From Swiss-Prot:
Gene3D superfamilies: 3.40.1370.10. This is Large ribosomal subunit protein uL4. The gene is rplD. Keywords: Ribonucleoprotein, Ribosomal protein, RNA-binding, rRNA-binding. GO terms for cellular component: ribonucleoprotein complex; ribosome.
């Protein structure tokens, strides 16, 4: 069992968060790579479309006579060598090219990414009160002070909370969104593995981490 320190808004350690050993079971790094590639590939619209010589709108009249001009013979203005002509080997919308990742692979990849952050000391656990009741109004200065008190490197920080705190965490969300050190504010129930991989440091609420461990560890037992 792994113990993680829990911090309050003043940066004081108030206890430990217990992580089961099953959370750190070995997994395939290839699954992480496949998952991240799928996320990026599926952002594409796959809608690029060009017109070939048979699709462009042009007269079928021969540009000039076959012989006597000294030019190479031409038969149609829709040919690709003419301005406004068709495109050769241009992109076309093909079949559905979205990459599908099943739930088990997705959860395994997210678990491995989180385990790496924990093992390298890039994830800290904040008490639920930090997200819910620490601020009575949005205060960017106080949010920055919290990061410094917890010895969090102020670079690429990702805040992760639970959807159960939506609304009550609005003051903290508004406080951190204007910090250049903060990468984003998301929720554990719909977190993306790409956000975890791209973040340098993660500040997660106790409630969000409980939900993540429950969903990810139960998957490893199946």
């Amino acid at each position: 069992m792994v113990l993680l320190s829990k911090f309050d808004f003043s940066g004081k350690e108030l206890g430990k968060f217990e992580l089961p050993d099953a959370f750190f079971t070995e997994g395939r790094e290839q699954s992480v790579k496949d998952y991240l590639v799928a996320i990026q590939a599926n952002k594409r619209q796959w809608s690029a479309c060009t017109r070939g010589r048979s699709e462009v709108s042009h007269s079928t009249k021969k540009p000039f006579r076959q012989k006597g001009t000294g030019n190479a013979r031409q038969g149609c203005l829709a040919a690709p060598q003419f301005r406004g002509g068709g495109i050769v080997f241009g992109p076309k919308p093909k079949f559905d090219q979205h990459i599908r990742i099943n739930k088990k692979e997705r959860r395994a990849a997210i678990r491995l990414l989180l385990a790496q952050k924990i093992q390298t000391g890039k994830l800290i656990v904040a008490e639920n009160s930090v997200f819910v009741s620490s601020l009575d109004a949005p205060k960017t200065k106080e949010a920055l002070r919290f990061l410094k008190e917890c010895n969090v490197e102020c670079r690429g920080v990702l805040f992760v909370d639970s959807l159960a705190h939506v609304g009550s965490n609005e003051n903290l969300r508004l406080s951190v969104r204007n910090l250049s050190a903060v990468r984003g504010f998301t929720y554990g129930e719909n977190i993306s593995g790409y956000d975890i991989a791209a973040a340098r440091n993660i500040v997660v609420s106790e409630k969000a981490l409980e939900l993540l461990v429950e969903s990810l560890v139960s998957t490893t037992k199946d």
